[in-house]
Amino acid sequence: MTQRAKDWWARGGIPTICWHTGADFFSGYPECRESELDWASAFVDGTEANRRLLDGLDHAVPELKRLPSDGVPALWRPFHEMDGGWFWWGRGGAANFVRLWRLMHDRYTHVHGLRNLIWVLGFSDATEDLRPWY
């Protein structure tokens, strides 16, 4: 993924990176539609679900850290179409999604120092009032 992003940047483009992952953060597209996160305990510090969530979010960090060394920015578009309800990150509702997004942004920016990411929130057309998802 990062080599393709670097190649695109070298040709004058700005790479976009999406992340289709299951709620375990290690599986792929089919699992993002079928798996679930334990929302009740995922944001409770010290729980097993919280540890799994933090480890899962960090799973993409080593790959993303390969970009800044070459001065490559990226349009980072995780958890898109969250308002549609067909992916695990949207089925937990708007409040949980916002907590997830903010946690990821905080970890990536402040804990891991990823400052080359341009954060993109990608809605579907399934919801008219998108304000709760911000």
Please annotate each region the language model reported.
Residues 123-134:
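Substrate-binding cleft/loops of secretory-pathway carbohydrate-active enzymes
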Residues 2-110, 114:
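Substrate-binding cleft of extracellular glycoside hydrolase catalytic domains
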Residues 77, 119-123:
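Extended hydrophobic secondary-structure segments that form protein cores and membrane-embedded regions
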